């Protein structure tokens, strides 16, 4: 993409990443669903959402509900075996060295975002929180759903909090729910 040269272009200071199929080479909800024995059902709901039959929020609620009863130890096993996108470790080392603030803004789950944060040193993680009771997923989530609009809102809030002009931000993602964030970032 061509961009107008200027001081803001040369001094990017915040970079926000999607997680699933961006920092990692999988969709965590599919991994969880396969372990819960509901992989086909979850993929069917995802396809309905992609066809526009249901929106992201509704598809999210339906897919999370199918995870009810899954033991949290499965999440730990999936986390330590996540297929990391090639170059993430080197990229994070360089971004930290040059002073970037880094964030994961994901429609996935905080458990896995926090794993990547501790492994690679991300500054922030915003994702969806799965509700757990007695060591099992309840099939519910807590807090606000992180969808495309929420990602854009979080990017704005991080820029304000870090006192960074939004033109000095970068957003990286792979899907339709990343478009709002990509559209408002200085580079997306």
Predicted regions and their residues:
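Non-catalytic pre-domain segments flanking phosphatase-related domains
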Residues: 1-17
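Active-site phosphate-binding/coordination module
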Residues: 7, 33, 123
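Asp-based phosphoryl-transfer active-site loop
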Residues: 12-29, 182
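Residue-level recognition of short loop/turn positions
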Residues: 19-20, 51, 134
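A generic alpha-helix surface/boundary motif
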Residues: 26-27, 58, 111, 153
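A metal-dependent, Asp-based hydrolase signature
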Residues: 28-97
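C-terminal cap/substrate-recognition subdomain and adjoining C-terminal extension
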Residues: 74-188
């Amino acid at each position: 993409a061509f961009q107008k040269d200027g001081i803001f272009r040369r001094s990017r200071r915040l970079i926000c990443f999607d997680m699933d199929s961006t920092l990692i080479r999988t969709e965590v909800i599919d991994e969880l669903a396969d372990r819960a024995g509901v992989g086909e059902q979850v993929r069917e709901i995802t396809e309905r959402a992609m066809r526009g039959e249901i929106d992201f929020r509704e598809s999210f609620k339906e897919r999370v509900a199918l995870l009810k009863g899954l033991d949290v130890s499965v999440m730990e096993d999936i986390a330590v075996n996540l297929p990391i996108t090639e170059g993430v470790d080197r990229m994070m080392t360089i971004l930290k060295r040059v002073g970037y603030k880094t964030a994961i803004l994901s429609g996935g789950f905080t458990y896995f975002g926090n794993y990547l944060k501790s492994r690679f040193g991300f500054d922030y993680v915003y994702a969806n929180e799965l509700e757990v009771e007695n060591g099992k997923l309840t099939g519910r989530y807590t807090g606000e759903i992180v969808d495309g609009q929420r990602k854009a809102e979080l990017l704005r809030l991080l820029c304000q909090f870090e006192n960074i002009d939004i033109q000095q931000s970068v957003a990286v993602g792979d899907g339709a729910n990343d478009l709002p964030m990509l559209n408002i970032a200085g580079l997306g």
